């Protein structure tokens, strides 16, 4: 059983690394990965211009338990919103430095990166901007 948990954790780390790289290629700056508080964890927190992006990463090896995106339920979305408030509270002094000066965030967006990593095909990435 420990081997299975270990394999799941390794798959999750792989997916989060792939997702972070994908977001960076889109021009985002990664601010935090696996940020934790008492209420839970945010996979990736990034900056996209003046927008704070909270990104949930779902990685699966197959679709036997459903597509990766299907696991982001309304309940999960509500929890991520609460965690985003906690992150913003903890990082109240965080500002976005730009060529025009220093500004706060003007919006928060919730994105999802779903990765299906089948051995025969390699990983495929589905990115949903503003998923909820």
From Swiss-Prot:
Gene3D superfamilies: 3.40.1350.10. Pfam families: UPF0102. SUPFAM superfamilies: Restriction endonuclease-like (SSF52980). GO terms for molecular function: nucleic acid binding. Belongs to the UPF0102 family. This is UPF0102 protein Acel_1550. The lineage of its organism: Bacteria, Bacillati, Actinomycetota, Actinomycetes, Acidothermales.
């Amino acid at each position: 059983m420990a081997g299975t948990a270990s394999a799941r954790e390794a798959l999750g780390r792989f997916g989060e690394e792939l997702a972070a790289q994908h977001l960076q290629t889109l021009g985002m700056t990664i601010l935090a990965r696996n940020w934790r508080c008492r209420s839970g964890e945010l996979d990736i927190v990034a900056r996209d211009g003046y927008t704070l992006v909270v990104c949930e990463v779902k990685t699966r090896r197959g679709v036997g338990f459903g597509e990766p995106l299907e696991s982001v339920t309304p309940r999960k979305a509500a929890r991520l919103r609460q965690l985003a408030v906690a992150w913003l509270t903890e990082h109240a002094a965080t500002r976005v430095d730009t060529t025009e000066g220093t500004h706060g965030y003007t919006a928060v967006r919730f994105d999802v990166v779903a990765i299906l990593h089948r051995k025969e095909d390699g990983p495929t990435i589905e990115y949903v901007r503003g998923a909820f």
